[in-house]
Amino acid sequence: MVEDGVVYTLDSVDLKHPIKQFPNKEYLKIITDIWLNADPPLVAIPKSRRVLMSWLVSYLHLHLAMFNEGARIYFQSEKEPKSAELLDRVEFIYDHIPQEAMPRWALPKIRRFKKPPKIEFVGLNTTIEGVPEGARQLAQFTATAVLMDEAAFWQMGKESFGALKPTTEGGGRVTVISSANKGWFYDLCYDKQQ
């Protein structure tokens, strides 16, 4: 998937060449393989800045949405505007899929909503929706997948993570990424959960 050359990112630091093809790096292939084959479908990834992890998991969730009818995917961040930024990445990746890889007519059509932040895949009954942290944010929903971004720094990170079990029970995928920080996320990454 990573090596296919269909993913483009936006690098706001490089103003001369801000649109870049996703790099074909071995560690990104390994993370992709782990994500695709995780059983149970829980992946926790400690990251450092500028390793493209947020872009990678945004792409993986976009791929999940584009090719699965009825998927309900949630991007959870500390605040709703931050989850909307992740949806901006998804939309950017979608808008920059090369015609040679998939002609526009073959792509599922999308509709973007700003409040609440959501991308709807028209005709597929599939959505990616942005939500803020909090144990009750997804309580009434069932989810195909939940992405928790920078979760180690949330005030209610552990509670938000703990509340996902009924939301994803039965096979829903949970992806937790964050810059390294001691606490519940560190314990999750290194199997030290109580």
Task: For each feature predicted by the language model, list its residue ranges.
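Phosphate/NTP-binding elements of NTP-utilizing enzymes
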Residues: M1-Q194
